[in-house]
């Protein structure tokens, strides 16, 4: 799946000028000259600094510097290059165009990848601190062990209803129906058979829920799944067998560990709280009133986290 390339927060010119302002105290260096007038760095800075895009680029730059100092040795150039090449291959011939549309050069995108990986590392380390018995037990309660099921995926609702009727008919050969009608390339040739538990990421949540609610050999009603783009697919699920759940959460410790870590690493509030803590520990001071609210989303997160303890 292609990972979306996020647009640069501000034009390269703005970034360069803002950076220059930070390094040149009170600079009135000309950046544009014309007949009878000039535009200085300080004039441009005064106009640009209140722009939301400029605010965002300064926030990104601050986060980059803070995480680079704290975790810079934890992310290698090789990791960054591998992630870059993965994106490049995913977009193919369109990669250069996608970068241009996002306002990014190749080097700027590599830098963005590196910053993301630094934050990901910090979030992972913070998530590991959440591996408590209490959280293991909570994850266990929500966990459903592996089931074996057969699925048929159909893109047309009318066709799906026809296949559903055939699948529920007495003596129906579900495996053959899957081979003849399913559009799911991973399971079609296997008669729709697939194994998964509640932590699986290769099966839609609605399909998992339908399977977990069935008895052996029962067939579900039509399950509708919509993509992020709103496109609907229709699933028919037959449960083949269930695995009996152990009464001891320790029996699933490795699996539950990944469940807990993944949940934290995908939780926006948790990620924000990690960034907030790093910014607080870095003792960030805002020297220009135009940027006084720059870190508000993180200071609020920090306050909320503290008050909830």
Swiss-Prot record:
Transmembrane segments: none
Species this chain originates from: Streptococcus gordonii (strain Challis / ATCC 35105 / BCRC 15272 / CH1 / DL1 / V288)
UniProt EC number: 5.2.1.8
Any GO MF annotation of the entry: peptidyl-prolyl cis-trans isomerase activity
Keywords recorded for this protein, A-Z: Cell membrane, Isomerase, Lipoprotein, Membrane, Palmitate, Rotamase, Signal
Protein topology in the membrane: Lipid-anchor
InterPro entries per record: Foldase_PrsA, PPIase_dom_sf, PPIase_PpiC, PrsA_foldase, Trigger_fact/SurA_dom_sf
Matches recorded under HAMAP family: Foldase_PrsA
Lipid attachment locations (S-diacylglycerol cysteine): 21
Family of the protein in this entry: Belongs to the PrsA family.
Record's function text: Plays a major role in protein secretion by helping the post-translocational extracellular folding of several secreted proteins.
Covalent lipid adducts (N-palmitoyl cysteine), residues: 21
Annotated GO biological process: protein folding
Catalytic class of the enzyme: isomerase
Catalytic function, reaction form: [protein]-peptidylproline (omega=180) = [protein]-peptidylproline (omega=0)
First and last residue of the signal peptide: 1-20
Major localization listed first in the record, in broad terms: membrane
GO cellular component: plasma membrane
Sequence ranges assigned to domain PpiC in this UniProt record: 144-241
Protein name: Foldase protein PrsA
Pfam families (alphabetical): Rotamase
């Amino acid at each position: 799946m292609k990972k979306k390339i996020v647009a640069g927060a501000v034009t390269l010119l703005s970034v360069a000028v803002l950076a220059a302002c930070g390094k040149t105290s009170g600079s009135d260096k000309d950046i544009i000259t014309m007949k009878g007038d000039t535009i200085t760095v300080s004039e441009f800075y005064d106009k640009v600094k209140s722009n939301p895009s400029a605010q965002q680029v300064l926030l990104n730059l601050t986060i980059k510097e803070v995480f680079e100092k704290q975790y810079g040795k934890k992310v290698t150039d090789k990791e960054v290059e591998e992630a870059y090449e993965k994106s490049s291959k995913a977009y193919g011939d369109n990669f250069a165009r996608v970068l241009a549309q996002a306002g990014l050069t190749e080097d700027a995108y590599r830098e963005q990848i590196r910053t993301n990986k630094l934050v990901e590392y910090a979030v992972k380390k913070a998530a590991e601190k959440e591996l408590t018995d209490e959280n293991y037990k909570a994850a266990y309660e929500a966990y459903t062990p592996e089931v074996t099921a057969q699925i048929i995926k159909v893109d047309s609702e009318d066709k799906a209803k026809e296949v559903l009727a055939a699948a529920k008919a007495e003596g129906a050969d579900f495996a053959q129906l899957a081979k003849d009608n399913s559009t799911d390339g991973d399971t079609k040739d296997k008669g729709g058979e697939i194994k998964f538990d509640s932590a699986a990421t290769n099966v839609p949540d609605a399909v998992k829920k339908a399977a977990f609610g069935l008895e052996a050999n029962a067939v579900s009603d039509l399950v509708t799944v919509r993509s992020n783009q709103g496109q609907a697919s229709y699933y028919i699920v037959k449960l083949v067998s269930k695995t009996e759940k152990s009464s001891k959460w320790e029996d699933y410790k490795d699996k539950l560990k990944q469940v807990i870590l993944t949940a934290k690493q995908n939780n926006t509030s948790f990620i924000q709280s990690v960034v907030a803590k790093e910014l607080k520990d870095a003792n960030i001071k805002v020297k220009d009133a135009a940027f006084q609210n720059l870190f508000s989303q993180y200071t609020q997160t920090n306050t909320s986290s503290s008050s909830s303890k």
